Each structure stands twice: as C-alpha cells, then as structure tokens.
C-alpha cells in the first residue's frame, strides 16, 4: 500500500497535468521568430526622408535657409565638448592619437561615397526639409550619396535629437550617431556635421594653421584647450588646397571664449570677421570632398565663375571669394541717428568688436554702454561730425606661443595638440 506522502505527490502531478491542458498553446510555448532576430538591427524611431520631404526642401527659399545667425552654436556648446565625438574624439585623446584634417585611411572613407542613413521620427516637417536640403546639396555638388539604410548595411548614420550638435569623423563602423538637436537644425550646421561624417576635421586644426591664425590662449577656458589641437601632416593631406578662412568647417573668432574676448584671430585682420561665418560650402570645401572620394568633378576652381562679388557657382547662393583674393569687408549698414541722444563733435568707436553687437545698440540694458564704446557703428553720431573710421581699437590680450597656456607652459597633452 502507498503511504500518504506518495498519494500527495501523485495528486500534485495530476493537478499540474490538468492545468497544463488549460493553458493556451501560445503561452505554453514561445519561439524566436525572424522578426526577433532582425529587431536589434533597427532603431525603434528610425525613418528615412520621403519624396515629400525632398519636395519641401526644394520649396525652401534661399532667403529662408540663409536668414540665420552665424553658426556659433557648434563652438559654444556646454561642457566644452565641441562637435566631434565618438571614436574620433576618443582617438584624439590617446597618447599616440592624432587628429587629421581629412581622413586618408580607406577604412575611414565610405565605400563609393555611399552613406546609408536613418533619421529620428522626432523631426518635424520643416526640420526634415532642412535635412533633405543639405542632402540635396551634397548630391548636386559632390559624388556623396546619402541613401536609406537597408538590412544589408551594417555601417550607417543615425541622425537624431540626441544631445546638441555633434558627429564622428568619417566611417566609424556600426551605428554611427550624428546629433542635430533642437537649435541645430539650420542648413549650415547640418552640412558642417555631415562633412564631419564624410571625413573632415575642422579647418583651424590644420598643422600649418599658425601661419594663418593666432590662438589667444589667455581667452580660452582651460577645459576647451583640446578643441584647438593641430592635425598630423604626416598622416593626412590638405589635397593641395590653401588654408580656407571661408570654410564651413572653420570655428568663429569667439570659439570657447571664457571672457567674451576673441580666441581665434586671423593673420589677415579682415579675415577675423570671416572665419566661422560661412552659411554654405566654400569652393575649397567642395574641392576637398571631391578629391577625397575621387569624384568625377574638376579638381580646380573654375576661374570664370569668380567675380568681384564672390563665388557664383550653383547651390545655396553667393559664394565667398577665394582666400587668395584680398577683398575688404563691406561696412555694416548705418543705423538711423537718434537726434535726442546724438553725440556732437568727433565721434568714433572705441573697440573693433562693435559689428558683433549691433543688435544691442537700442537695447534698454545696453544702450548706455553701446553709446560709450560703439557710438559710430550704432548711429549715435551727428553725421557731419562723425569721423570716417574708428579710433584705435582696444588691444587684444597678448598672444602666447604654441607651447604656452594662459598660466605658463601647457601640459604635454596640449603641447602635442598644438
């Protein structure tokens, strides 16, 4: 005879068998499907640009695309991280790592100039149109092609609102992030970040940059020193092109300033106002892209398209003059003179930075200061008594040598980067 314990075990087994028949087969068994295996290959919110997006891009007027402030958002992001991140930023911090103006490694280039991409579904219609416009300009002026990603593309760009404006440089491998967050969706910012992805660092990081610009270390925040490194000439090429003040890859003169004073000053004084102000590719930008990817395009600039008004090629609008052409910058349009506060007698500006602050001339908070330092530019002078040019500007802070920082010799890391 079976004891009570055995009977209890049999009863439990019978209950389990009975319950198993009551459970639906979909819950009793679960198998991995083809969809489960493919899911990790896709981003949850990823989409691609549609034909409607490209149609909207064509409708964007040149004035609308170009009516934007200078692209200072890139060089004034929080935490001094700059707009180069990912493997490129990590490599630049290694002991043996160096930055390069244009990548020379075949591995870093996108095969045949084909760049698979997806974008975040968070972008609205206007933002997608700006992205599509940037893609169109690459397609029409270079052999670079941004194409929707397929399941066969392991290396691709994911463009999303991640954290500010940044990109890796060249083809990094796998899912490669390019962030164009709120505030970054401007045409010039988009082509700048995409040019990083194509394979280019900043123009002011060229190895020969000290022949063309001066770094004012006294005005740079310590945490941003590595944003002013130099590229390694032995491992890269400038593709036979001169230093390009007009490049869309150049930072502005106030980049990473800790005190509002200039950090980058051009050796040619009139170029200080030019650097970092590009709203489109320069002719040299396009030449370097086409040379890097062996595009079936001319390797020289068509001189017939150069006039006194600058580059007249196709695309977004007027092009900047060639760097070799020394054209004076046009003076800012004079503001209406206010008779009630007009300054009688000899009148002039007391600083060479007034052109940057013209929007503050009639500000309630800044009017008194602007009247004191920028009377001529702000239109506070009586026209008959105004002098024709500004008074001697307040001198900039002294320039330090390449191996010096604002507080003496720079650490080895910064000496290595320039």
Curated annotation (Swiss-Prot):
Protein name per its UniProtKB record: Zinc metalloproteinase nas-8
Active site location: 193
Regulation of catalytic or functional activity: Inhibited by ethylene glycol-bis(2-aminoethylether)-N,N,N,N-tetraacetic acid (EGTA), ethylenediaminetetraacetic acid (EDTA) and o-phenanthroline.
Pfam families: Astacin, ShK
Cofactor binding remark: Binds 1 zinc ion per subunit.
Reactions this protein catalyses: Hydrolysis of peptide bonds in substrates containing five or more amino acids, preferentially with Ala in P1', and Pro in P2'
GO molecular function: metalloendopeptidase activity; zinc ion binding
Disulfide bond entries: 143-295, 165-184, 347-381, 354-374, 361-378
The organism of origin for this protein: Steinernema carpocapsae (Entomopathogenic nematode)
Positions contributing to Zn(2+) binding: 192, 196, 202
Upregulation: Induced upon parasitic infection of insects.
Enzyme class (EC, first level): hydrolase
Entry's pH dependence statement: Optimum pH is 7.5.
InterPro entries, alphabetized: Astacin-like_dom (IPR034035), MetalloPept_cat_dom_sf (IPR024079), Peptidase_M12A (IPR001506), Peptidase_Metallo (IPR006026), ShKT_dom (IPR003582)
GO cellular component term, pick one: extracellular region
Function: Metalloprotease.
Propeptide: 29-100
UniProt keyword terms in alphabetical order: Cleavage on pair of basic residues, Disulfide bond, Hydrolase, Metal-binding, Metalloprotease, Protease, Secreted, Signal, Zinc, Zymogen
Cofactor: Zn(2+)
Any single biological process term in GO: proteolysis
Entries under PROSITE patterns matching the protein: ASTACIN, SHKT, ZINC_PROTEASE
EC number: 3.4.24.21
CDD domains listed in its UniProt record: ZnMc_astacin_like (cd04280)
Thermal dependence: Optimum temperature is 37 degrees Celsius.
Domain Peptidase M12A: 101-296
């Amino acid at each position: 005879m079976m004891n009570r314990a055995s009977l209890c075990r049999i009863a439990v087994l019978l209950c389990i068998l009975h319950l198993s028949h009551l459970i639906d087969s979909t819950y009793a068994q679960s198998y991995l499907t083809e969809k489960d295996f493919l899911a990790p290959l896709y981003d949850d919110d990823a989409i691609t640009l549609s034909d409607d997006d490209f149609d909207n891009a064509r409708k964007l007027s040149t004035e609308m695309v170009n009516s934007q402030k200078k692209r200072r958002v890139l060089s004034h992001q929080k935490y001094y991280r700059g707009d180069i991140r990912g493997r490129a930023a990590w490599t630049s911090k290694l002991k043996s790592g160096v930055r390069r103006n244009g990548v020379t490694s075949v591995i870093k280039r996108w095969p045949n100039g084909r760049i698979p991409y997806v974008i975040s579904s968070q972008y609205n219609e206007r933002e997608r149109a700006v992205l599509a416009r940037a893609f169109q300009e690459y397609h029409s002026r270079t052999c670079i092609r941004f194409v929707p990603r397929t399941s066969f593309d392991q290396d691709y760009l994911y463009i999303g609102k991640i954290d500010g404006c940044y990109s890796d440089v060249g083809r990094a491998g796998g899912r490669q992030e390019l962030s164009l967050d709120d505030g970054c969706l401007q045409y010039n910012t988009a082509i700048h970040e995409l040019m990083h992805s194509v394979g280019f660092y900043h123009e002011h990081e060229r190895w020969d940059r000290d022949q063309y610009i001066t770094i004012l270390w006294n005005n740079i925040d310590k945490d941003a020193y590595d944003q002013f490194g130099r590229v390694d000439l032995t491992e890269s090429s400038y593709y036979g092109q001169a230093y390009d003040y007009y490049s869309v890859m150049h930072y502005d003169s106030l980049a990473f300033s800790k005190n509002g004073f200039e950090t980058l000053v051009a050796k040619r004084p009139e170029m200080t106002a030019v650097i970092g102000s590009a709203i489109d590719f320069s002719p040299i930008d396009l030449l370097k892209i086409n040379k890097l990817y062996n595009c079936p395009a001319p390797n020289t600039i068509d001189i017939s398209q150069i006039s006194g008004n600058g580059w007249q090629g196709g695309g977004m609008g007027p092009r900047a003059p060639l760097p070799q052409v020394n054209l004076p910058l046009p003076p800012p349009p004079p503001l209406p003179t206010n008779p009630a506060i007009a300054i009688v007698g000899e009148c002039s500006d007391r600083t060479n930075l007034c052109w940057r602050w013209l929007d503050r001339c009639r500000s309630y908070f800044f009017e008194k200061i602007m009247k004191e330092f920028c009377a001529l530019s702000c239109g506070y002078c009586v026209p008959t008594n105004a002098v024709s040019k500004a008074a001697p500007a307040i001198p900039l802070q002294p320039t330090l040598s390449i191996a010096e920082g604002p507080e003496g010799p720079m650490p080895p890391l910064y000496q290595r980067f320039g």
